Regions:
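Phosphate/dinucleotide-binding and metal-coordinating scaffold of catalytic cores
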Residues: 1-158
Length: 158
C-alpha cells in the first residue's frame, strides 16, 4: 500500500454536461500540495468505461479518452505564480518537434458545497463554488501511447 498514491476521496465530476459519479481524487505535487495559499493540485481517476474525452483550448478533442486527470494549481512551490505557462509551453513545444509530451489545457473548476453559488456577505466570494483556474495535464499511461502514436513497450512508462 502506497499512501501517497491513495485516492482518499470521491466526487461527482461534471464535464460538458455529463456527470461522472464516484470519481476518486487525491492531492498531488509532493510537499507543494500543503502550501499555505489554499490552492491545491489534484489527480482524478475516472471509473472503467466512463472516461471523459477532453478537448484543448481550441475546442478540438484529444485523440483518446483520459482515465486520469492531473491538475496543476499554477503556483510554484516557492510562492511564485507560474499560471502553468512553463509547463504548457514546454509540452506544446515538445509535441511540435515530435517529442511526445502530455497534452495540456487550462480550465476553471467549481467545487459545489451548497445551494448558493456565491453566498452573500463580506467573505462570500471565498465561500462560493468557484475554485479557480487550473492547468489540466495528460497522464502517462497506455492512452498516452495511443494518443501520441507510440509503440507499447518503449520504456517511458513506470
Amino acid at each position: 500500500y502506497d499512501a501517497r498514491s491513495a485516492y482518499n476521496w470521491n466526487c461527482s465530476f461534471v464535464y460538458e454536461g455529463k456527470v461522472y459519479d464516484n470519481v476518486g481524487y487525491r492531492l498531488r505535487q509532493r510537499n507543494a500540495r500543503y502550501s499555505g495559499n489554499g490552492r491545491r493540485s489534484f489527480k482524478f481517476r475516472f471509473n472503467l468505461g466512463s472516461y471523459p474525452k477532453f478537448h484543448n483550448t481550441d475546442g478540438k478533442s484529444y485523440p483518446t479518452e483520459w482515465k486520469y486527470l492531473a491538475t496543476h494549481k499554477m503556483k510554484g512551490s516557492r510562492g511564485n505564480h507560474t499560471w502553468g505557462i512553463e509547463q504548457a509551453a514546454n509540452h506544446i513545444l515538445w509535441n511540435m518537434t515530435g517529442t511526445p509530451a502530455p497534452f495540456t489545457h487550462w480550465f476553471h473548476m467549481r467545487v459545489v458545497r451548497g445551494a448558493e453559488e456565491a453566498p452573500k456577505g463580506g467573505n462570500g466570494q471565498y465561500q462560493g463554488d468557484y475554485y479557480g483556474m487550473l492547468l489540466a495535464m495528460e497522464e502517462f499511461d497506455v492512452r498516452f501511447l495511443d494518443a501520441h502514436n507510440l509503440k507499447k513497450g518503449n520504456g517511458i512508462l513506470p
